[in-house]
Amino acid sequence: MTNMMKALVKAKPEEGLWMERVPLPEIGPNDVLIKVRKAAICGTDVHIWNWDEWARKTVPVPLVTGHEFVGEVVDVGSAVTEYRIGQRVSGEGHIVCGHCRNCRAGRGHLCRNTLGVGVHRPGAFAEYISLPQHNVVAIPDDVPDEIAAIFDPLGNAVHTALSFDLVGEDVLVTGAGPIGIMGALVAQCVGARKVVITDINPGRLALAKKLGVRHVVNAREEKLTDVMRKLGMTEGFDVGLEMSGSASAFRDMIDVMNNGGKIAILGIAPTGFEIDWNKVIFKMLHLKGIYGREMFETWYKMIALVQGPLDISGLITHRISADDYREGFAAMRSGEAGKVVMDW
């Protein structure tokens, strides 16, 4: 093994990413060195490519990007006991402090000192990545590499969907991006009654239908009240999963929620927006923000789901070499792709 590797780097404070040779990551006593097999492009990576306001405020330059991956252990620190060389693994992309109140209470996903892999520290768009052993997750033999490579966004979907009891409930998902589609499929898998997903992008809606979401709605062409009437719903949705970051979608969701309904909010809006808080109050709605994955309960549940009834393979629309990364980012930026997985 040489001391240099190929990596996709945010090398300059401007639009784009660049393939460069960078030093191999060093590992400490508690770290695991992983040879990356496959890595997927996330919406966060697109923000970093675009160098938008969030990226400019958040991402240090230069930085190896990427955080959705699967790979193989090639070296371990002297204190690592849980992982062995040759083992297939992925990793939790949020590095937590371990000493704040939430971490000490077992709520690491709420750590106030979280560092993001590929956002604050070197990431997975590289031949190798180093992670603390606490963040490494073993991948079962019956889970394919390309599915393990998208566990990070699947975890977002699972965390959001399983925030509330869904058995026998009517569920509205706003936003048919990859995470929204996976959230809808999870809801169906665990026993929701009616699951409706909305978007205004025909390509995304077609992908949702292809993957098996039962009720797919173009919000520009059909009113949710009409959809509810067709489905025999008389009182509104019990659970909402907001995956779009769209002000109009969120307002529409509030309008059609049943009294006492629960909304899990993962979609990030580009700017702040107003909602009618009187509706939230008088409907007695429960709003819950979602960030990342519960460590590590979400990982256990999503692995069990893909080993069982949940098939998300159709969500991967582009399989490319890492050298063709520009093509992959173009597909993601077009809004027409599902998941783009790169071979390293």
UniProtKB/Swiss-Prot annotation:
Names of required cofactors: Zn(2+)
- Gene Ontology terms: cellular component: cytoplasm
Under SUPFAM superfamilies, the record lists: GroES-like, NAD(P)-binding Rossmann-fold domains
**Annotated active site:** 44 (charge relay system), 47 (charge relay system)
Which positions does UniProt annotate for Zn(2+) 1 binding? Answer: 42, 67-68
Q: Keyword annotations for this protein?
A: Cytoplasm, Metal-binding, NAD, Oxidoreductase, Zinc
Q: Give the first-level EC class, as a single word.
A: oxidoreductase
Main localization of the protein described in the UniProt heading: cytoplasm
For this protein, the record's SMART domains field holds: PKS_ER
UniProt-annotated binding residues for NAD(+): 179, 199, 204, 266-268, 290-291
Q: State the InterPro entries in the record.
A: ADH-like_C, ADH-like_N, ADH_Zn_CS, GroES-like_sf, L-Threonine_3-DHase, NAD(P)-bd_dom_sf, PKS_ER, Zn_alcohol_dh
Return the similarity comment. Belongs to the zinc-containing alcohol dehydrogenase family.
For this entry, the protein name equals: L-threonine 3-dehydrogenase
- Can you name the source organism? Chelativorans sp. (strain BNC1)
